[in-house]
Design a protein with these regions (language model features):
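Glycine-rich catalytic cores of cysteine/serine-nucleophile enzymes that process amide/ester linkages
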Residues: 1-52
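A structural motif
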Residues: 62-75
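Acidic/histidine-rich, surface-exposed loop or edge segments in extracytoplasmic proteins
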Residues: 47-56, 76-83
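Short coil/turn segments at secondary-structure boundaries
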Residues: 54-62, 86-89
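Structured loops at beta-to-helix junctions and adjacent beta-edge loops in soluble globular domains
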Residues: 14, 63, 146-148
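Activation targets extended, charge/polar-rich intrinsically disordered C-terminal tails
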Residues: 76-222
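Solvent-exposed loop/turn segments at secondary-structure junctions
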Residues: 15-19, 67, 80, 93
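Extracellular structured ligand-interaction cores
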Residues: 8, 57-59, 95, 140
Length: 222
């Protein structure tokens, strides 16, 4: 958002064409192309409210120069020849892509409160997916089929940032350290800007579960 220029736009790295040939198969293989999309805030907020999805906003504590650089990076990334990227669910997704642009835009370095590269989380990719797919058993079942054994290896905090909630947490603790060694918080303030009143229970999938389906199949075969 830029009050001076009258800009209130949302850059979304999560756009894709579900009707593209072999979308699900290519997604499972990690060969899906996503792209950066831009929309005005009002349409974005209306869509998320309709879908029952709350939205948190983190106001970044950037200098005017850093803001201009970030806008320039996003604008360049949105050029037709640059906006499409090879999506990877764990390593290059709609959460990690904007992080890279923010880290490039700042003058200095972005320092996180925790050691981001140490394998000290005690969690794996599969652990995180199970945590955030609770109540969506068929989705969890499909993801388990697609993931290999490496999904069970411990990951570090930076890799865990493929989950937006972890990105949010680590950004809240991060500091920008400029070239003179002066530090300031990355996030100036945080607020919920789309409030739907929905709870996780509202999104729990109903009907037969994968385990029930397998049990039924065994009974029929027997």
């Amino acid at each position: 958002e830029n009050y001076t220029r009258g800009i209130d736009a949302v850059f979304n790295y999560g756009m894709f064409n579900f009707n593209a040939p072999n979308f699900i198969f290519r997604f499972a293989l990690g060969e899906t192309d996503y792209q950066l999309g831009v929309t005005d805030y009002e349409h974005f907020a209306a869509e998320y409210n309709y879908l029952g999805r709350d939205v948190w906003q983190q106001t970044l504590n950037l200098t005017e120069e850093e803001k201009e650089r970030l806008i320039a990076l996003l604008t360049e990334n949105y050029r037709p020849e640059n906006r499409v990227y090879r999506y990877n669910f764990f390593y290059d997704n709609c959460a990690t892509s904007p992080r890279e642009q923010i880290e490039r835009a700042i003058n200095g370095t972005l320092q996180y409160a925790d050691n981001m590269t140490a394998n000290s989380t005690g969690i794996s990719f599969r652990d995180l997916l199970h945590k955030y797919s609770e109540g969506h058993l068929w989705s969890r079942f499909g993801m388990d089929l697609c993931m290999g054994s490496k999904a069970d290896e411990p990951i570090n905090r930076r890799l865990a940032m493929f989950v937006p909630f972890y990105m949010q947490e680590y950004f809240n603790k991060a500091q920008i350290v400029d070239k003179e060694g002066q530090a300031r918080p990355l996030v100036a303030k945080e607020e919920k800007i789309v409030v739907t009143g929905k709870t996780p229970a509202d999104f729990v999938s109903r009907g037969i579960t994968p385990m029930q389906s397998a049990s039924l199949l065994l009974i029929l075969v027997a």
